[in-house]
Amino acid sequence: MQFAKYFGYLDGVPAQIYMRVLGIDPGSETLGWGIVDGSGLKYAAVDFGVVKSNPRNPFPQRLANIYEGVSAVIDSFQPDVVSIEEAFFAVNVKVALKLGQVRGVLLLLAEQRGLKIAEYAPRLIKQTVVGYGNAEKHQVQEMVKVLLRMKSVPTPHDAADALAMAICHFHHAGVRDRIERSVRKIP
């Protein structure tokens, strides 16, 4: 499926009709990414993969590896938006802190590149993609395959989760934009 990049008007306001979304499943050892092109609820996968970091390397070195890996993805695919999972409360505090640092690096990178940033709760992503907020990982992967008309489930699961985040953005972008515009109008 090919999409042409063009702009139109929504409620008299210039609006981007086509989007290229980079979905990111943050992780300090394996970070999933997925590129999805589309317009409205018509979208297609462009590419997906992972950025792997050696768990034996010092954590700052892993963060640098993540920054460089995602920078390369952004340079290659030129997305308009980065869709990333919101911070969530993990059972292990150490893991939650590391994930927060990874998210910080990713948010900084997106901001430096002038990309729109959309953050979604894990439950909303599952609700959007599967129709059930407590869906299992395999259910999310299967629905990503169906929604993106893929022949097989995208692997590894980190990449499938990243594609799910991009899909989630296509379903919620219009609502987010309308809310942002209405908030800007309030004196």
What are these model-derived regions, one by one?
Residues 1-187:
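Phosphate- and other anionic-substrate recognition elements at nucleic-acid/protein interfaces
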